[in-house]
Amino acid sequence: MTRIDISTIGFTKTSAENFFERLLKAGVRKVIDVRLHNTSQLAGFAKAEDLAYFLKKVGGIDYMHQPLLAPTYDILNAFKKQKGDWNVYQRRFLSLMAERDIESRLKPDLLSGACLLCSEDKPHHCHRRLVCEYLNDKWDGRLVVKHL
């Protein structure tokens, strides 16, 4: 069983310099954007087209948007806008991933050298951490996860 190195990162509460330096230092080869909407204005450098350009230019890093790994609008809205409970959000998102059968629809090799991107600065209350934990459980602990 081959181990797969994967990172996660959030782009808020950081500068563009710090964001890109962390990716480069970690040796990230591909950023997988797991946001529901990848046109966020929360940070100027994180808008989809701009981000893809900067990643390629700064570090030769590929970019892809993977909405399969994003929560639905309803799940996200209940937590963010309506100040919902994290445990409810977590339970609903884990159920959504199971319903979507993400462990069968994604190949582990897709995540090798990749970094899951979302807006949250820390992974504690972010779905990118839940994605890694869910897949690690389904893929027999193959993922070696580092939160940048």
Model-derived features with residue positions:
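Residues lining hydrophobic/aromatic ligand-binding pockets adjacent to catalytic sites
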Residues: 1-148
